[in-house]
Design a protein with these regions (language model features):
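Short glycine-/acidic-enriched loop or helix-start segments at secondary-structure transitions
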Residues: 19-20, 44, 83-84, 126-128
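Conserved glycine-rich Rossmann-like NAD(P)H-binding loop of the short-chain dehydrogenase/reductase
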Residues: 28-38
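NAD(P)H-binding glycine-rich loop region in Rossmannoid oxidoreductase-like domains
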Residues: 40-41, 47-96, 100
Length: 148
């Protein structure tokens, strides 16, 4: 089976990112590049790049060789500390990590077809306080400020 699909999974060692990596590799026709701050063991179709997504120069240098990437799955999130009221302090760094990584891949690869932004329950405002239950996917999202 030809391996012409190549994915970059940003946040590859996180809760969601590691399952995206696992799923893509299980499908058999993907090559996967995982990005995270921590190093990770590589495999036959898996390469890992340890990178600081907030350091634009580090990102540009380390991702410049990704000329054949077709997909980016963005699952990284840098949490803040303290109460939900401090959530506004994590918006800028998370936005910057997203912009830095996707921009670097888009510049390196002329084959980029799709970027997938993986979101969670913060889309609905769970970080702002109690919500109605049960929640439904059709519930309205909370309005910005948010990095999503």
């Amino acid at each position: 089976m030809p391996q012409n699909k190549k994915a970059v999974v940003v946040g590859a060692l996180g809760v969601i990112g590691r399952y995206i990596v696992e799923k893509l590799l299980a499908e058999g026709d993907w090559q996967v590049v995982g990005l995270s701050r921590r190093p990770e063991k590589e495999g036959p179709r898996y390469r890992h790049i340890s990178v600081d997504l907030l350091d634009l120069e580090d990102v540009a240098r380390k991702l410049s060789g990704l000329a054949d990437v077709t997909h980016v799955f963005y699952a990284a999130f840098q949490p803040g500390t303290g109460a939900a009221a401090n959530y506004a302090t994590v918006i800028a760094p998370n936005r910057d990590m997203l912009v830095n990584s996707v921009t670097a891949v888009a510049r390196a690869s002329r084959r980029l077809e799709r970027v997938v932004l993986v979101t969670g329950t913060k889309y609905y405002g769970t970080h702002l306080g109690p919500l109605k239950t049960p929640m439904r996917e059709t519930d309205p999202r909370h309005m910005p400020p948010d990095f999503y």
